UniProtKB/Swiss-Prot annotation:
Positions marked as site (Interacts with substrate peptide): 135, 142
Keywords recorded for this protein, A-Z: Hydrolase, Metal-binding, Metalloprotease, Protease, Secreted, Signal, Virulence, Zinc
PROSITE patterns for this protein: ATLF
Cofactor dependence: Zn(2+)
Signal sequence annotation: 1-26
CDD domains named in the record: M34_PPEP (cd20183)
One Pfam family, short name: ATLF
Modes of activity regulation: Is inhibited by the chelating agent o-phenanthroline in vitro.
Region of interest called Interacts with substrate peptide, as start-end residue ranges on this chain: 101-103, 117-119
Organism: Clostridioides difficile (strain 630) (Peptoclostridium difficile)
Protein name as annotated: Pro-Pro endopeptidase
């Protein structure tokens, strides 16, 4: 028996919804809940700063699955938005003149890096996009992914399962001398692709199907 046109549309709709991250079709209530959680995590700078860009960063962070954001909150992690250099902050002053891992030979030091993530997250406002002192698809999602990897998922990027995936797909997102060398960087960048928007999500699914499935299963 041939299915009706309405049934076909319904089946196709279900398939499309199931193939994208939760954030891509989250309702306004879910997004607002994520923003409420972020209001307890994100620390804005004092003084003058680009409030529109800072709010845009928060909006992009709100795409992340709420269970990760809640876990960060429960672990008392703060995402600090900065109006100036990372190393101008007292807590990161010790990084002045230090060359970051993977940046050897670039002539760059932490003074030039717009963000960091792990046990803490710090992000320069206005440096979200690729080419703004970094090669990540999105600064805030990439660095927050490091914190989720380390704090929430117990360094899952170092797990045998992920390393097997990394061995097959770690060079598939470009920047092979960085993403293709460090599993934790490939995890963070893949996470950013997964949650940034529908276009980047689709690119990840096409280029790195095993990584995509890995992230999809983690979010369940």
């Amino acid at each position: 028996m041939r299915p009706s046109k309405k049934l076909l549309i319904a089946i196709i709709s279900i398939f499309l919804i199931s193939s994208v991250p939760v954030s891509a079709h989250a309702d306004s209530t879910t997004i607002q809940q994520n923003k409420d959680t972020l209001s307890q995590i994100v620390v804005f700078p004092t003084g003058n700063y680009d409030k529109n860009e800072a709010n845009a960063m928060v909006n992009r962070l709100a795409n992340i699955d709420g269970k990760y954001l809640n876990a960060l909150k429960q672990n008392n992690l703060k995402i600090k938005l900065l109006s100036g250099k990372l190393t101008d902050e007292k807590e990161y002053a010790y990084l002045k003149g230090v060359v970051p891992k993977g940046w050897e030979g670039t002539g760059k030091t932490w003074d030039d890096v717009p963000g960091l993530g792990g046990s803490t997250v710090a992000l320069r406002i206005g440096f979200s996009n690729k080419g703004k002192g970094h090669d990540a698809i999105n600064l805030e999602l990439h660095e927050t992914a490091h914190a989720i990897d380390h704090i929430v998922l117990n360094d899952i990027s170092k797990s045998a399962q992920f390393k097997q995936i990394f061995a097959k797909e770690g060079r598939s997102l470009g920047n092979v001398n960085y993403l293709g060398v460090y599993p934790e960087e490939f995890f963070a960048e893949s996470f950013a692709y997964y949650y940034l928007n529908q276009d980047t999500n689709s690119k990840l699914k096409s280029a790195c199907p095993q990584t995509y499935s890995f992230l999809q299963n983690l979010a369940k």
